[in-house]
Regions:
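Phosphate-binding beta-alpha-beta segment of Rossmann-like dinucleotide-binding domains, i.e.
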Residues: 85, 93-143
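A short, aliphatic-rich alpha-helical micro-motif
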Residues: 39-40, 58-61
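N-terminal glycine-/charge-rich "phosphate-binding" loop or analogous flexible N-terminal tail
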Residues: 1-43
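Short acidic active-site motifs
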Residues: 32-36, 52-57
Length: 143
């Protein structure tokens, strides 16, 4: 089985030895659209994060049986074309669930506490010019 990873940079050096042991593996740091067919022409499995794989590309890859997306989103893959050709498409379900929740909470707290406003207030020097050590220009909030 020949496995090709088109954009290894996207996994930030994570250990993928278990994938490499599954067959003849070749990984590319990045891949431009015009390099996809040449690099994958004998591949059974293609792993991608951002590289687009459309119907025309699939038609040029007769051995392709599986596309693995190293992300949650699969908008770079023509899913209908893959289904029509019997090519399975899998993604990294739930890999960033905690990060998304943390980012959402962080953003909510940032908005609630007006972090951007106060960051600019301090950096602009307005804080040091103020007659008082507090600022009542904005409402305060607590959780």
């Amino acid at each position: 089985m020949k496995i090709v990873f088109l954009d290894e940079y996207s996994i930030c050096g994570r250990n993928i030895d278990s994938i490499k042991q599954l067959g003849e593996y070749i990984g590319y740091e990045t891949t431009t659209p015009d390099q996809v067919v040449e690099r994958c022409k004998e591949a059974d499995v293609v792993i991608t994060n951002k590289v687009v794989i459309d119907a025309a590309t699939m038609d040029s890859l007769p051995n392709l049986r599986l596309i693995c997306v190293a992300a949650t989103g699969m908008n770079n893959i023509d899913l209908n074309a893959a289904a029509e050709r019997g090519i399975e498409v899998k993604n990294a379900v739930g890999y960033s669930t905690y990060a998304v929740a943390e980012t959402t909470l962080c953003s909510a707290l940032s908005l609630l506490r007006e972090v951007t406003y106060y960051d600019n207030f301090f950096k602009s020097g307005e804080y040091s010019k103020a007659e008082r050590i507090f600022n009542f220009d904005r409402p305060t909030a607590q959780i």
